[in-house]
Design a protein with these regions (language model features):
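A solvent-exposed interaction/effector surface
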Residues: 1-160
Length: 160
């Protein structure tokens, strides 16, 4: 595996309105059912429209890696709708600078890539100002093999 430091890049993350769903899951495999079979139909029922460019990500609230993953799913929508039991709407402000790295492969190995990105931020004196976003770009829905899956890990920072 290449050195993460050679693959880190910076970008801004736009202010958007998001449909969100938070719950505890036992493993990342549950996302394969949660997104298309629970979140998707509820967003459709509420009349959500997802504008281009599409932007969805997950945020984890656990302090340590393990089971009972406290996760929140965010998907950008054109406008705020009325909250439901499953879906809450939030507006997130722009993130002027995020350190990013692309993780390829299974979700179970993302904690190692995240740890390397976090270490890179600390080593280079960046102040982390919010939780990391795990933006699932390529996955089971559009790729043949797990090795082709790509998740962009976005770490909001403040430049010193």
């Amino acid at each position: 595996q290449e050195n993460v430091m050679e693959k880190v890049f910076k970008k801004s993350l736009p202010s958007r309105i998001f449909a969100t769903h938070r719950r505890k899951i036992d493993s990342y495999q549950e996302l394969f059912n949660l997104c298309p079979n629970i979140i998707g139909p509820e967003m459709y029922r509420l009349g959500c429209e997802c504008p281009a460019p599409e932007y969805c990500f997950t945020v984890e609230y656990n302090e340590e890696y393990g089971v009972d993953i406290d996760i929140e799913f965010f998907e950008a929508v054109a406008e705020r709708k009325e909250d439901s039991e499953l879906i809450k709407f939030k507006e997130l402000p722009e993130v002027p600078v995020a350190l990013c790295v692309n993780h390829y492969g299974a979700y179970e190995h993302m904690p190692e890539t995240f740890a390397e990105l976090f270490a890179y931020a600390e080593t280079n004196g960046y102040e982390v100002i919010d939780r990391a976003r795990f933006c699932h770009i390529d996955g089971i829905w559009n790729k043949e093999t797990v090795d082709e899956w790509m998740t962009e890990i976005q770490l909001p920072i403040k430049l010193s």
